[in-house]
Amino acid sequence: MDEKDILRNLREEEEEEEENQSEETKILISSLPWEIDYLGNKLFKYQGYWYYEDVLQSIPNIHSSFQPQETDIVVASFYKSGTTWLKALTFALVQRSKHSLEDHHHPLLSHNPHEIVPYLELDLYLNSSKPDLTKFLSSSSSSSSPRLFSTHMSLDALKLPLKKSPCKVVYVCRNVKDVLVSLWCFLNANKGVEWGDFSQNEKIIRAENYSFKAIFESFCNGVTLHGPFWDHAQSYWRGSLEDPKHFLFMRYEELKAEPRTQVKRLAEFLDCPFTKEEEDSGTVDKILELCSLSNLSSLEINKTGSLGGVDYKTYFRKGQVGDWKSYMTSEMVNKIDMIVEEKLKGSGLKF
């Protein structure tokens, strides 16, 4: 048997394995409880969290094939919590010896952070159990270390691969009220995008404008993609308390209030602390400027580029803390505050 035949047989075996795994997952999904979300898509509840069917199918792929290296870094978040910013900061930090912050060809000047740091469940393992990890900029070279990945999944969903081989995980948490407002604005800025389960032929609901009230009620009920929000946040909060060497819990509000302190904290956690020479030469401030909302949003790639039908410019809005005050009624505020207080009781986590 020549080399071509061996490779062909290996591919056929892999395809058969993926088909069998996909069928097993479909059988599992058919037995799960489900609800209709504010986008008109089915959400399935699996091990306490809500997923679209196609995202749910990526979980077995991640569990069976994702093998973290000790030097890997996973940027984790609930969506609309500062993910884009944290991806940019993390890449700039760990790659600063390779990519000078003053280089006019720095990758962040020509690539959106979501291109550079791929999602495990969306970009890599959504349709494959053995994705090509080398096609992404942050892991394109065999000598590229650390590799950078991201996820919106809870820590509970990632425990299996991380147990086999722990790596560094950075989680950014944001006040749920600002998450709600940011999500609503983001969805309405991308009205032409078919959100949700792309394997679903028809949405049950179609709307020109996404209802803020509907999104609010879904969050309050905990029925939202990767939700409930409070369980998601608590999974990483517990991880940071139990294993601070591998899990860092960051708050968006603290990043905004004291960016220099928080970026230095992030660098320490990622084992790439700033030297005295770097601090004296303003390296911290250069990273903050490179990754700032004003700088990233002004770049041509982020003004005109897109990925998956989503315009990059819609990832950059106000980035303000407390913007929810312009959108939420006092009744809404009281309701969600009471729910969050109750759900977080005894955890030590507060907003």
UniProtKB/Swiss-Prot annotation:
GO cellular component: cytoplasm
Annotated segments matching region Disordered: 1-24
Top enzyme class: transferase
InterPro entries registered for this protein in UniProt: P-loop_NTPase, Sulfotransferase_dom
Disulphide linkage map: none
Statement: the UniProt record of this protein carries the keyword Nucleotidyltransferase: no
Keywords, in A-Z order: Cytoplasm, Transferase
Residues that, per the record, bind 3'-phosphoadenylyl sulfate: 80-85, 174, 182, 252, 317-319
GO biological process, one term: response to cytokinin
Biased composition (Acidic residues): 12-22
Location (main, coarse): cytoplasm
Any one GO molecular function term: sulfotransferase activity
Pfam families, per the entry: Sulfotransfer_1 (PF00685)
Expression triggers: Up-regulated by trans-zeatin.
UniProt biased composition (Basic and acidic residues): 1-11
Tissue: Expressed in roots and leaves.
Family designation: Belongs to the sulfotransferase 1 family.
Biological role stated in the UniProt entry: Sulfotransferase that utilizes 3'-phospho-5'-adenylyl sulfate (PAPS) as sulfonate donor. No activity with brassinosteroids.
Name of this chain's protein: Cytosolic sulfotransferase 9
Organism of this sequence: Arabidopsis thaliana
Gene name, Swiss-Prot/TrEMBL: STO9
